[in-house]
């Protein structure tokens, strides 16, 4: 009896161990989460809840109304565990709780622990099913005995009269630290914010020492009282979890697609469509303060700004080349790896860029979404349209400060600058020739291997690169879409038109250092330079004849093959050379484009006009070495 009084005095001195004042049911202590709230808890918070539920039900299972309750109190010091003090507390009250079966609760605890471990092993999300099963044990008793006092109320009187004793079983060492860590993690990680219509749970401050209970109560109250901060921009609906917001967006946006009225492209968010629509409207709200250039996206402005600052933060680990954009670095890396992740489903051709695949796919579909407003011609790629619009004088022109040559886009002039800077990074290992771009080296390499992957479906002729095939196809179709605004002459390719325009402007930016002769294009200068060096790089494999020009080599080959690809529809006559075909066409059509400036006489060919002009000038260029006589 004295021992019991001493134990009672020690218990009263300990802070927070006073018995509860007033009636408290078991339901008030057993905190429950709804399914929506449960999904918002992270694994550490769920583990904390599990520990609380198991602790409560184990204590409930251990209560024996008619027996004594043994209590062990563990205390710790800085040096370690101290001696265990054991006391006996006899129960003075006895409560009859009917035929409630404590063994049933024990089985539910075992099933709950087993199911929890199975869910963890199978990486499944723990559900509330087993937790509800525990509280259902008391609910089922109440339904079976409607005449008796609710079991939860009776358990509340019995169970909570010993709550201070049960609290002593909670260790203040390792487990306490782990739970405290879980609570700290919960306060930092918890993002679920929700206003609940359910009544708030109030509990006496005397239970603050019950660490599990107070921690879970705090967690529960935070879930209830915080605002919803995750809002869907499309529907305006708010959520207390980012995961719930994502699920909502998938459901809401899954059936709601935004389609572009111009090109038919579909987007799942309205802001993406608005951004895309600027491509068609030409709207560019973002302006560079340095040069005044405008952009349709803020990210493009940020990337452009690095051109002024010279910042290139992205570096290739293979060749140390630096880039101003991360996307350019990723694209460049594929040169080293040889990766071509974008594959055509029709012909299985692979590409390094998604844009190249998109443009290539239009070859199969025949789609040409980019239309010229001047002439109505449509193109499969936007860059091709921009290049075409230069014919009409549309768009910004870029002028080279060194040779004053004009270009239709910034990329072309950047490549042109390398001519003056002699920046040639790519070298052919076979002949030692340098190239400004890797694509040029790839095309050049085919001259050594003899590879000609591009084939004409009309005549079966093959070519080293696609551009040559495109130019060749115009021979069969007769199409000449490029027209000179000065004289009305038409051409099959834009490069031919550019060369022709130099006749009217008189512009000849390329000068020969040997003889001072000037030319309107670099290729003509390179061809002329072979006259001084005597270089003849093109050799006939049949007769070993060499040529200084590739075109002469190609024309010569037809002597051996007998090929005559140029056919006159009027007289069913074929020619091996395009010039012969064109001359014959003028004869049939009566066209005489070449006019003498002195007498006004017109001729069908340029060579005929030159020969005629010698009559006026008196020039006699051809001399007989045997007799010394000269002729015009």
Swiss-Prot record:
Cystine crosslinks: none
Molecular function GO terms recorded: DNA-binding transcription factor activity, RNA polymerase II-specific; RNA polymerase II cis-regulatory region sequence-specific DNA binding; zinc ion binding
Membrane spanning residue stretches: none
Record-listed cross-link Glycyl lysine isopeptide (Lys-Gly) (interchain with G-Cter in SUMO2), residues: 220
Keywords, comma-separated and alphabetical: DNA-binding, Isopeptide bond, Metal-binding, Nucleus, Repeat, Transcription, Transcription regulation, Ubl conjugation, Zinc, Zinc-finger
Gene Ontology cellular component terms for the protein in this record: nucleus
GO biological process: regulation of transcription by RNA polymerase II
Zinc finger (C2H2-type): 230-252, 258-280, 286-308, 314-336, 342-364, 370-392, 398-420, 426-448, 454-476, 482-504, 510-532, 538-560, 566-588, 594-616
Family the entry assigns: Belongs to the krueppel C2H2-type zinc-finger protein family.
Function: May be involved in transcriptional regulation.
Protein name per the record: Zinc finger protein 860
Species in which this protein is naturally found: Homo sapiens (Human)
Gene: ZNF860
